[in-house]
Regions:
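Helix-start/capping segments and mature chain N-termini
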Residues: 1-85, 103, 108-304
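ATP-grasp fold ATP-binding core
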Residues: 95-102
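Phosphate/pyrophosphate-binding loops at sites that engage ATP/ADP/AMP, CoA/4′-phosphopantetheine
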Residues: 86-91
């Protein structure tokens, strides 16, 4: 059972979470015409009266870009201002997840984006580990990732996540923790809601943006961090067979953080993961604002 934060932002005001309700006739419920973001907030280990938000500006920019797909003009700085106020009003002292959402709010039918009202809300919930930090087993899904020429995949468009939902349930019901999806070219592109990285021969490999992947903010941060750590990085298509003989592999995302892959189908991956661990440790230090070289990645929200 999720524990939701007490205050939400809904219809241009802050109000109790339980009072933020929409009609069953809301357009976005029927047509998937929405876009969402997701970011974590954690208490500052050095000062519990502060909340740390990782790469807030990037999250707000991506959501603002997603709004453009929906023909909605919502500036990134406005999203950021609302999220900061949302954090202050909730006064949370534990790790939590923020879900901002843009959607077509009209009541009625007919799939369209023109001449229709849009709105924006924010809510949150307490969140610990989304996936096991010790590692997950993955099934290669029978469902394929949509192609970018069919759907705008660079943002988190809500209707597109039916494929992720089908793949995740298929994986769990067949005894796995997570699903890996291939694109229409038969290349591994991402998990149900996370990007994927593979380590082979000391090189960090991940599918590029031309492989129908989400423009992951954690993914981008890992690539920058790996280069700064002197780890060779390559963005290229990833074959299914490569995963079976990978030295290491992991998933990345705001909710998942860095989650090792311990098994793909019936192929066990090595239990020693030096590159994964090195990046993971450094990323934790950055998100906790303990690395002065990356302080511009962390937005500090005072609760006082």
């Amino acid at each position: 059972m999720h524990k939701f934060l007490p205050i939400a932002y809904f219809q241009n005001q802050f109000l109790p979470f339980n009072d933020a309700k929409i009609s069953i006739a809301t357009h976005a419920l029927h047509y998937g015409t929405g876009a969402f973001g997701g970011l974590r907030g954690i208490p500052d280990p050095q000062n519990p009266d502060q909340i740390l938000l990782f790469r807030l500006d990037r999250h707000c920019k991506r959501l603002s870009d997603s709004a453009r797909y929906l023909h909605y003009d919502l500036a990134a700085d406005k999203i950021q201002s609302i999220i900061v106020d949302f954090v202050k009003k909730n006064q949370v002292k534990t790790s939590f997840y923020i879900r901002p959402f843009i959607y077509t709010s009209d009541l009625g039918i007919a799939p369209r984006l023109h001449k229709i009202e849009k709105d924006f809300f924010v809510y949150g919930l307490e969140l610990g580990d989304y996936l096991s930090p010790d590692g997950v087993s993955c099934r290669i899904s029978s469902w394929y990732r949509q192609a970018d020429h069919s759907l705008p995949l660079r943002g988190k468009i809500s209707g597109a996540y039916i494929t992720s939902s089908l793949a995740k349930t298929e994986a769990v019901e067949s005894g796995f923790d997570e699903a890996l999806l291939m694109n229409s070219q038969g290349k591994i592109c991402e998990a149900s809601g996370m990007n994927i990285f593979v380590v082979r021969n000391g090189e960090l490999i991940t599918p590029g943006y031309d492989q129908d992947i989400l423009e992951g903010i954690t993914r981008d941060s890992i690539l920058t961090l790996a280069k700064d750590l002197g780890i060779p990085t390559i963005e290229r298509p990833v074959d299914k067979s490569e995963l079976f003989i990978a030295d290491e592999a992991f998933l990345s995302g705001t909710a998942a953080k860095i989650t090792p892959i311990k098994r793909v189908e019936n192929y066990e991956l090595p239990k020693t993961r030096p590159i994964t661990q090195k990046i993971r440790d450094q990323l934790i230090a950055i998100t906790e604002n303990r690395d002065p070289n990356y302080q511009d990645w962390v937005y500090v929200v005072p609760l006082g």
